[in-house]
Amino acid sequence: MNLSIKENKETVRPVFPFTAIVGQEEMKLALMLNVIDPKIGGVMIMGDRGTGKSTTIRAIADLLPKIEIVKDDLFNSHPSDVDLMSDENKHALQNGINIDKAYIKVPMVDLPLGATEDRVCGTIDIEKALTEGVKTFEPGLLAKANRGILYVDEVNLLDDHLVDILLDSAASGWNTVEREGISVRHPARFVLVGSGNPEEGELRPQLLDRFGMHAEIRTVKDPELRVQIVEQRTNFDQDPKKCIENCAKDQIKLKQQIADAQLLLSTITIDYDLRVKISQVCGELDVDGLRGDIVTNRAAKAYAAFNGQQTVNSSDISKVITLCLRHRLRKDPLESMDSGEKVEKVFNKVFNLEEI
């Protein structure tokens, strides 16, 4: 009972408005594009301490419209999309059994650093399965995060094996748990957001490459901007309700823009010539594999949809290509140029642009 009370309190806890966040445009753009198209593959946010990483991630989750689920379902199953529902609900749908529906806020799940594999994936009661022949599954954090956002702070300190599991589930949209020959599978489609401080160590390149985007954020140096950030935070801490009310109009406008972009996304086209140039940039940067090409195409379409366009242009690509490729470049200790600057330089050369 006490746990239930605690959860209810957390649900009504005021969240700093996304539209009130000053600066950090790169991080905000990466999060919005992943929300518009979760197939981009999540975002890794690396930056200094105290730069608003956690605040921004919680704010984007709070901004999103409510989702329709099967009532009291442990996996946030979609009531009609079979790719987003559990086997039990799929069976009920196929047999014409009436399914009760409900609306909830987009799930925002925090993965603690000390989490075990069982806590993340869920557990099967082997004893009950063997003695009674009943599959009893205790869902983990991946089930809770289905159709939502899974946030891992200090992901660079997380066990590599767990990072692998998260990335596999995020890419496939499913979580499979196998114990002693017994297998349980459930939908686990979520936006994976990792954050960390580069001073505390980097992720292995093989794992970093699996993140769709990589945003780098730095402490704001402009004194006027710093004052504005401090004022915004102070106003929110003193009177959260008033701060949220002041931002309500901008929040509603952005929420609608994201919802419209999600609907428009499937109709967006990108010319063959532009696709060739994207691959040319990846080739000249010596990017391993094809993930860079695929993610850049998806991100450019999501950006075009966000702006209400029907087709992708070179300006759209310029806004997303650094986010999609900077973490895929091979590390050269003798290279003085920042990886982001290198991507921009090659992009301008391939697209015959001096500056965007």
Curated annotation (Swiss-Prot):
SUPFAM superfamilies: P-loop containing nucleoside triphosphate hydrolases. CDD domains: AAA (cd00009). It holds the Pfam family Mg_chelatase. One of its GO terms (biological process) is chlorophyll biosynthetic process. It is found in: Plastid, Chloroplast. ATP binds at residues 47-54. Gene3D superfamilies: Magnesium chelatase subunit I, C-Terminal domain, P-loop containing nucleotide triphosphate hydrolases. GO terms for cellular component: chloroplast. One of its GO terms (molecular function) is ATP hydrolysis activity. Keywords: ATP-binding, Chlorophyll biosynthesis, Chloroplast, Ligase, Nucleotide-binding, Photosynthesis, Plastid. It catalyses: protoporphyrin IX + Mg(2+) + ATP + H2O = Mg-protoporphyrin IX + ADP + phosphate + 3 H(+). Its EC number is 6.6.1.1. It is an enzyme of class 6 (ligase). Belongs to the Mg-chelatase subunits D/I family. Involved in chlorophyll biosynthesis; introduces a magnesium ion into protoporphyrin IX to yield Mg-protoporphyrin IX. This is Magnesium-chelatase subunit ChlI. The gene is chlI.
